[in-house]
Amino acid sequence: MKKNFSRIVSIVAFSSLLGGMAFAQPAERGRNPQVRLLSAEQSMSKVQFRMDNLQFTGVQTSKGVAQVPTFTEGVNISEKGTPILPILSRSLAVSETRAMKVEVVSSKFIEKKDVLIAPSKGVISRAENPDQIPYVYGQSYNEDKFFPGEIATLSDPFILRDVRGQVVNFAPLQYNPVTKTLRIYTEIVVAVSETAEAGQNTISLVKNSTFTGFEDIYKSVFMNYEATRYTPVEEKENGRMIVIVPKKYEEDIEDFVDWKNQRGLRTEVKVAEDIASPVTANAIQQFVKQEYEKEGNDLTYVLLVGDHKDIPAKITPGIKSDQVYGQIVGNDHYNEVFIGRFSCESKEDLKTQIDRTIHYERNITTEDKWLGQALCIASAEGGPSADNGESDIQHENIIANLLTQYGYTKIIKCYDPGVTPKNIIDAFNGGISLANYTGHGSETAWGTSHFGTTHVKQLTNSNQLPFIFDVACVNGDFLYNVPCFAEALMRAQKDGKPTGTVAIIASTINQSWASPMRGQDEMNEILCEKHPNNIKRTFGGVTMNGMFAMVEKYKKDGEKMLDTWTVFGDPSLLVRTLVPTKMQVTAPANISASAQTFEVACDYNGAIATLSDDGDMVGTAIVKDGKAIIKLNESIADETNLTLTVVGYNKVTVIKDVKVEGTSIADVANDKPYTVAVSGKTITVESPAAGLTIFDMNGRRVATAKNRMVFEAQNGVYAVRIATEGKTYTEKVIVK
């Protein structure tokens, strides 16, 4: 009782010193609205920071009650034993090659005397209990100077696909531990500008364009990014996925690849043994890099199939990582490619992961009322040393509130003390579409509830599968000697039907306490569309962008967490949050074999419409202004059926047949009684006693002749028809 009374007195007395600044328990926080881009020019950007929601929490130390400061978006990265002084960070797009500098243009501050700031506990692992780690005052408390010293700094430059960036860090709290003086900067304005010197970690753009699929990411990560900075590639580029699969699973992956192409994601297969034999991490890394650097720059996803012994993770001291395969440009930890894994030890393990993924994207209907229900799980630990000074329960409550505001209809909260495996089993079996876990973990279980791999067989949530954002130690250690927690959930099935989860992000190592909380916050904010410039619809996109925010704020520790936070499942999975609604889709029932385009009307802008032929993509387009105009990239044969597939966020997938009719330019004749030659723009056709006709790609007849024809063409694709001796031949001709 005496301890609590001292804490309250400390807060009240200290509050009066700052004239209205609050000293209280941690509050719900989002992005700091007081950080603004004042100007952005070719070689310089100005950024303004203003203090927002400064709060203090009293904690008991060897020197009595000391204060732990927090403010909106402030992050404690102070070294162990030094004063806890949060910083705030923002990323800027910078010169591709020049070194940058930061200068303070103006600042305002107030000073308060006789303030004891608590020492940092450093980076705390989730294998530990923060409450059992004492506050230890280090050597810095004997130094008569302000910490950390500079109020604005730049981190090392990084590269995110086609854009070079740099983080500007604001340190608005400066503390002299000898005089016990706290300097509070209420406003800081900085200019970040190019210098004449060559920079580090530079980038050379081989073309004046960026891949459209990353535009929203650039806008979200870089506060000064403009889409007009480069000329985007055509929007038809919906990205590309490569599935790297061991030879033994090559045939088993076909249904998955066919579906991905059918729903509009160009997907290819690469047999792992064709990359290297034996398969090594270095070989996988080099292969992904080579594919990324191919013309078009459209590689977006890589799915690894198999366990560690089939396709190894990259192992370096303290790191077991799949994510590094997607870190290609520069020497930083920002992924250019989203990485996921179907971890399997048998064909059955693989089949259930394929089945659950296809069903989730293709077969969900308006009757799937389990969507829109979520599970939040938290330990009873955490507090001042955690992200935003939140306990795990406070953290999950903030997430629960966010989900409710977005439209989730039911939130199940399982908070320690007292959570049991049955609580988790009942939540899964009752139907949930999302689970957030924040707490302790082991290779095979969650610490809160002790729900683990031995309980997975009790799950009966057949094809009612949530995806999971998991903050815990080693739940994703797929190098462990038995299937880890994440693997068990992805392989789970009951009576041959998938149970468990459709995707989970889980760590291969002991996670830090604070930094993954920031990543988890951002994942949920992206999911709930809190950032208009960063709308992501795939599991890989949501999770990786959440981790980008973690790296920006927590620097080196954030990088380590990103490298080891592993996606189990398809990184291109189109996530669902709420009960889907139907789209109104209309399209012709027939298409000419010589058509160049196919138009689809749809009442949901942003939907993806795709024509495919037995798992081969013919063309795809995004719905804009109520229609999608699909350009046909592949030739189509007449008298066949194509499949029109339309997918959309929280929509019922639409699949229709489209019959091909008319003259095909795909039937190329060889060794026939005619010759067709192209010289420049001249098409010459010769055949004795034959009728000759040329059609353009729209099926229009543009030229006719007998026996011999010379036609001056424009650039394009043409069909040449030769009718002779009672037979008709058709040949495709390209004029460039």
Curated annotation (Swiss-Prot):
Positions that bind Ca(2+) 2: V329, D332, Y334, E336
Annotated residues for binding of Ca(2+) 5: D613, E639
EC id: 3.4.22.37
GO cellular component terms attached to this protein's record: extracellular region
Record: residues binding Ca(2+) 3: E390, H395, D521
This protein's UniProt keywords: Calcium, Hydrolase, Metal-binding, Protease, Secreted, Signal, Thiol protease, Virulence, Zymogen
Any GO BP: proteolysis
Compartments it resides in: Secreted
Residues where Ca(2+) 4 binds: E522, E525, H531
Active site, per annotation: H440, C473
Biological function: Thiol protease. Acts synergistically with RgpA to catalyze the maturation of fimbrial subunits, such as FimA. Its proteolytic activity is a major factor in both periodontal tissue destruction and in evasion of host defense mechanisms.
Family the entry assigns: Belongs to the peptidase C25 family.
Protein's recorded name: Gingipain R2
Species in which this protein is naturally found: Porphyromonas gingivalis (strain ATCC BAA-308 / W83)
Encoding gene, per UniProt annotation: rgpB
